[in-house]
Amino acid sequence: TVVPLGDFIINLKESSTLRILQMSISVECETSVESKVVDKTAEIRNAILMFTSEYTVESLTGLEGKMDLRDEIQLRINAIIKPHRVERVYFTKFIIGK
């Protein structure tokens, strides 16, 4: 089952200019885990917003940066819904802008 977590607009950590990340995230999980993800959506969204604001444009540029963020999101979600887990995290939108 794929569960959308919605749109995110996050101020990135930049010293000189305001930069934002606009992204949409969905997660894939077993059908039996879907209700746990939905029940914890506010906590999951808060965690994603808080730790992603520490990223810089440079750290998110390129495939490796996006994969690192995706892996970190999956780890954080799985910590929140433990002992359940999500199998995959999908970016359905990923835009860095001013």
For every predicted segment, state its role.
Residues 1-98:
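Flexible, low-complexity charged segments
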